[in-house]
Amino acid sequence: MAEKRLSLLIPTLSKRSKLCQELTDELTRQLTTEVEFMLLPDSGQRTIGEKRNALLEAAVGDYIAFIDDDDMISPDYIEKVMTALEADPDCASLTGLIYDGSPSPRTFIHSIEYEGWYSRDGVDYRYPNHLNAVRRKYAEKVGFPEISHGEDRAYSDRIQKYLKKESKIDGVIYHYYPHGSRAK
């Protein structure tokens, strides 16, 4: 079996199976031997933090990134992430679009260049969080609080002290649909 460079981790709810299937179809189309993706479905018995920790524990890649089951990735997502990881960074930056019902999607950028989480001129700037590819050893050190809301922000706050070297990914590679808006 080939060594895995990247583990893509997807906690999912059974009620989102159609959306998750669309996502996994796209992942399967892009998959390489150096990348694994893992799903952890349930019907809401566990908190999202618990599911993220379980997936993290099962991951074997040098790097991990989470993808939310109701979001979507760009057709070149894996290629761009893997190219960024060639430089052996602590993490890779991430640019995406937020589809929140506004006339036009908003841009978000996750990078170690930004301290904290803030918005300016219609762009959301964030320190890396669960959506960014980060070294698995750092993600394992900090883990997620076993809560259902805010676990991503807590993870982001905890992991930032370990992230010193970043590879920049150009272009939009992630499509975020808050509160299940992709299903509507």
Where are these regions (language model features)?
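Active-site donor/metal-binding and catalytic loop motifs
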Residues: I169-K184
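Glycine-rich, basic loop-to-helix element that forms the pyrophosphate-binding segment
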Residues: S43-A59
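The conserved acidic donor/metal-binding loop of glycosyltransferases
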Residues: D68-M72
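A recurrent flexible, glycine/aromatic-enriched loop bordering the glycosyltransferase active site
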Residues: Y99, Y114-V134
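Acidic donor-binding loop at a coil-to-helix junction in glycosyltransferase catalytic cores
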Residues: H149-Y155
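Conserved donor NDP-sugar-binding/catalytic core segment of glycosyltransferases
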Residues: D76-T107
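Short aromatic/hydrophobic "clamp" motif used to bind/position activated sugar donors
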Residues: I64
